[in-house]
Amino acid sequence: AELMERGETVYDINCVACHQTEGQGIAGIFPALAGSDIALYEKDKHIEILMEGVSGAAMNSFDYLSEVELAAVITYTRQAWGNAEKGDGEIVIPKDIVDYKEPKI
């Protein structure tokens, strides 16, 4: 519950302008997060997008956020707007972000 509250706050500050209050995005410009395959199922891809941004798109990297903030906002978007019921509802913990940052061998 605390992760969700923190995630909603991080979302409201960093994400809402493009992805909108209900995660619906803006058609043709900013993708919806509500019902998105990435938010429903692809946890690792979800982490990668926030860490790296999306080349050629308006989505910048948010790697300046703390591990806790990143885990919270990713969990929030995976749980909010009916996503938990439609998808795997998998939560992201700060360790997932730390693990992502580890050098890949």
Language model features with spans:
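A general structural signal marking secondary-structure boundaries and capping sites
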Residues: 22, 54, 80-84
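Electrostatic cytochrome c docking/interface patches
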Residues: 1-10, 25
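Short, surface-exposed helix-loop/turn micro-motifs enriched in polar/charged residues
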Residues: 22-25, 88-89
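The canonical Cys-X-X-Cys-His
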Residues: 7-21, 73, 77
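Gly/Gly-Pro-rich "capping" loops immediately C-terminal to redox-active cysteine motifs
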Residues: 24-64
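Flexible coil segments in periplasmic/lumen-exposed cytochrome c-class electron-transfer proteins
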Residues: 1, 63, 67-68, 72-105
